[in-house]
Amino acid sequence: MSEPRADGAKIEIHLHHEGAAPPEFIRRLASEKKVDLSKIFDNTGGYVFTSFTEFLRTYEAACTVLQTPQDFYHLTRAILEECVSHGVIYTETFLAPDFCGNSDVAAWRDYLAAIEEAANHAHQEHGIVMRGIATCVRHMGPEQAKKSGLCAAETAGDFLTGFGMGGDESIGHQGDFVYAFAMAREAGLRLTTHAGEWGGSQSVREAIHDLNVERIGHGVQCIKDPALIEEIKARQITLEVCPGSNVALGVDVAPSWAEHPIKALFDQSVRVTVSTDDPPFFHTNLTREYDMLADTFGWGAAEFCVLSENAVDAAFCDAETKKTLREKVRKSWINT
């Protein structure tokens, strides 16, 4: 086994922008805007929920105080400073047009410009690189998703490089959202979607066959389906695995860290990566994720380098950025 070490350069490709909002940031905005959000916090000031459905309600309630592009500028600065503190050199965050101007293209442009400005400032100050992935919200339905897809297509470029879908996986089917994904694909955006977190292996198959994505958010349910694992490998699809989130929410294939399927997938040469999903909701960060992998599975620099290089390979960014990231990853983990 490699010696445990979690202080190298990290790459994160599954991070919900609003879901990364520190609770103190949301509480302050709520106070300033005179919005009562007391029910979504516990007596320590953290987010509170007892099920995935309640988590979604808490998440969306927190978003109600994120009302202006300036709010998102400050949120982005807070998120990226937190990322930097855990050794993250590159992150992709999911940005929902539904929470940024209610999927109005003109308003979305203003929100996205503020987020990009904050990302540029963070890059200048800390060296961290950020790219955005616009996302539709599954439980808001296919028609609303089309609006998000249009927002994404109209703003595709060097900063907004991908399109995806989050939300409640139990609602509808992946194929219901083909139109939104087709718009994004035609605009040159790279594609991912949440699948196989709650919806079983069939949800992953639908994502691959109906939406033609190159990455799967979570995807851990594939552990139940050897044929699907082989298809994922053959298609070179990357899984954006979020172990701490899965354990915190009680996903059936991950009742504990020791039973999480990431090691089995890694050992079968599936392209897995590690991210935090909605870190303050699940009391995690990328340092903790790596530390838990080290403590649970004995992973160290060699394994973490593979995880990080998998993320670089799957990142929705240009070749030159990937080259720089790969050099930093290898230097920090294996000193070559």
Predicted regions and their residues:
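Metal-cofactor-binding active-site regions of metalloenzymes
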Residues: 1-189, 198-203, 210-215, 221-238, ...
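Short HxH-centered metal-ligating active-site micro-motif
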Residues: 194
